[in-house]
Amino acid sequence: TQQLVKNVTGDNQNTVKRKVMEIYRAQELEKRYEKDEILEAYLNEVYFGYSCYGVVTASLKYFNKDVSELSLAECASLIAITNNPSLYDPLQTDWGLENNRTRQLLVLGAMLEQEKIDQAAYDAAKEENVVFSNGYTILGGRVDVDTDKKDDTDTDGGDEQPEEETETATSSQSY
């Protein structure tokens, strides 16, 4: 809750006054909202790198999928990024990919320990081959999908058929 308050207010001063205000605001939020609502708000505000704010843009950036299509392993990999987007970035470097995997396993382990998932779900997620995709560009939290598609409107009166949509080249990494 305090992290949500910090993200929303944008106050990054390292002062006692800021911290006290953050605690107070967090307590006020917890009086008004359920934990699930606070978590949802946090997940829609948290930074994932590449100008991605929120899980919706992050799922498109890192997996080229809608957030509703993510597996447990992919969700844990995204959550891993929030701790330190530069350190746990699976797309930048091999060590970022390795760091993300280590953190993903830590997230899954915490979920198992807190009984948010069972052993079978943990084992399946741990064994899943997670493939990261870099097929989308996120600009300012908005998704910019690059596709080449000819206009369906025939302006010269010919019998030319519209070209089929071509996919943009993507790069990917996996563990």
Role assignments for model-derived ranges:
Residues 1-175:
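Non-catalytic, structured segments within soluble enzyme domains
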